Regions:
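Alpha-helical transmembrane segments of multi-pass membrane transport proteins
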Residues: 1-427
Length: 427
């Protein structure tokens, strides 16, 4: 009964148009002060202790690094390198877009940032070369979602904070699924381009490819710094995030020199605004998780599902459907922070690995970024292409279907996400 009251109250507040962060906080306060005897001091204490976790600091640092890389010329050099490698195949610039998104995802940690950085440069070039606008938008919108699967990933950090799962293990677990999804999206792009005889670029020699690689090497080296540092134990994921922010600043301002010192304050301010928004959501989500735990709702749900004889296969199917539906009304950060603390105890009781479960949730969030009505990547791509959301939704379907097939693969083949972290000894 209490669970029903909590969720009805939350959805009613959300339907009024109230921001999700305020809806969460108001739901918790209303329920606690009208239905329980919890002292107000404990709520205030939870607000501060809930966001004291060291791992949370990774979020603003990865956001800052992504902003420096977006404005610092790294994306343009990655696109040039990707184009030199695959531009001569069917749908050359489209394939270059997939590859560039995968490379930028490995240094940014954010899907919308990837779409902005790659799409703002590549989409006008694709239209100019004769590609239909819908084709380019479909490629970049869906490939940009790799930003939260290929590590580092802000969504994985949020899952880690919500469930106390190792961030390092999650990052390593996202590598193979991320590369596989990039390959599948590339194959979809190639197939559609070949079917419709879209333009190809002239093949360039290895000298030009080597030159493009050297120009992009400073950006690509950040992948080695972050992942290599975590794997070797040189620094924690949070320290890796701080290192990536400093490294991105140095590369953007002093190496590539595409950004002057006068632009740095604006980048810092934009990063602070985005970080404040996410941290405010996290703060209220921590309160919501505290309420769930105090009312023993996750435990009750786990006992009920197990009592009904629901096994891991059926449970994971239910989770996928639930998360895809949630993606229609909420953005990924809110979904992870609300749903992970509820679903995680059930998953562990059913013997599902926490790292595998985290990758499954992340892939669901990727799909949610690309379908209406609140798919963030759709709105970002719409701003770049000036296409309507309905038109964009139709354009992304071939790639979205590929992502749904991949979701099934990730869900029911755990070694896909677990093999690498186990082989590296991080879990």
């Amino acid at each position: 009964m209490n669970a029903a009251i909590i969720f009805v109250l939350l959805f009613v507040l959300m339907l009024t148009g109230m921001p999700i962060s305020i809806s969460l906080g108001l739901t918790v306060l209303t329920f606690l002060f009208t239905m329980t005897q919890v002292p107000i001091e404990s709520v205030a204490l939870k607000l501060f202790t809930g966001i004291e976790k060291f791992e949370i600091m990774a979020i603003p640092f990865f956001i800052l690094a992504g902003n420096f890389l977006t404005h610092g010329g790294v994306a343009r050099r990655m696109i040039n390198f990707a184009t030199s490698m695959v531009g001569h195949w069917h749908g050359g610039l489209g394939l270059a877009g997939v590859m560039a998104c995968a490379l930028f995802a490995a240094v940014s940690g954010s899907s919308p940032a990837t779409v902005v950085a790659i799409g703002s440069i590549l989409l006008p070039a694709m239209v100019k070369q004769g590609f239909p606008k819908g084709f380019g938008a479909g490629v970049i919108t869906t490939s940009g979602a790799l930003g939260i699967l290929i590590p580092p990933s802000i969504v994985m950090v949020m899952y880690s904070v919500s469930t106390n799962t190792s961030v390092g293990a999650l990052f390593m677990a996202g590598v193979i699924p991320g590369l596989m999804l990039a390959t599948l999206l590339g194959l979809t792009t190639w197939w559609k381009a070949r079917k419709n005889d879209y333009p190809r670029m002239p093949k360039v020699g290895w000298g030009a490819r080597l030159k493009a690689f050297r120009e992009s090497a400073w950006g690509l080296l950040l992948i080695v710094v972050v992942m290599g540092g975590i794997y070797t134990g040189l620094f924690t994921p949070t320290e890796a995030a701080a290192m990536s922010a400093v490294y991105a600043f140095v590369v953007a301002v002093f190496v590539y020199k595409d950004m002057g010192l006068k632009q740095v304050p604006k980048v810092l301010l934009d990063s602070a605004n985005m970080s404040a928004m996410l941290l405010y959501i996290i703060t209220n989500a921590v309160l919501f998780s505290f309420l769930m735990t105090s009312e023993q709702i996750p435990q009750a749900m786990a006992d009920w599902l197990i009592g009904k004889g629901l096994g891991p296969i059926a449970f994971l199917l239910v989770v996928n459907v639930l998360l895809l539906l949630a993606g229609n009304v909420m953005e990924p950060s809110s979904i992870v922070l609300i749903m992970a603390p509820i679903l995680f105890p059930v998953a562990t009781k059913l013997g599902i690995d926490p790292v595998h479960f985290g990758i499954l949730i992340t892939v669901n969030m990727e799909v949610g970024m690309c379908h209406p009505p609140v798919g963030l990547n759709l709105y970002v791509a719409s701003g770049i292409t000036k296409m309507g959301i309905t038109e964009l939704t139709i354009a992304v379907w071939p790639w979205l279907l590929t992502m749904l097939v991949f979701l099934v693969l990730v869900t029911y083949w755990p070694p896909l996400s677990l093999w690498l972290p186990k082989a590296l000894g991080v879990m």
